[in-house]
């Protein structure tokens, strides 16, 4: 069996100004080029660009890759971090069209599944933008998020995942 070194939850500067109404407009200052360079440096095989409420950044990354051979070995797939009407977030992998934000969680999940996408509950117990128990509606569950500002959020996610026998990822 072989393993793929994969980044499942990351943003670039195209995520800016696409966040929810109650969130600050600035999310990330990493350019597409810098993100690709960092991915090569980390020896990644796969990258899912999960910008907030947009596929921008993914599209630009594909274009940049086409013009720069050194990134050809890195596989890049479409994804989006969608904001619900309650300002919680859902990761959606493998979509071809953006999913509209500010919908209910169930509406977002239906839209994702209509595209054959996989859904993930990111940072499910963070202090803000978390799905909490509604995470059970998603396909996968993020037990570690490097951006959580407290150590308890990841630990609580890990315990919750074990109690509910969830399939987990780290982002």
PLM-predicted stretches and their roles:
Residues 1-86:
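An N-terminally biased module of ancient metal coordination in phosphate/nucleic-acid-related enzymes
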Residues 6, 10-26, 58, 94-171:
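Domain-core and long-helix interface of multi-subunit machines
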Residues 88-91:
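Active-site segment of extracytoplasmic enzymes that catalyze sulfate/phosphate-ester chemistry
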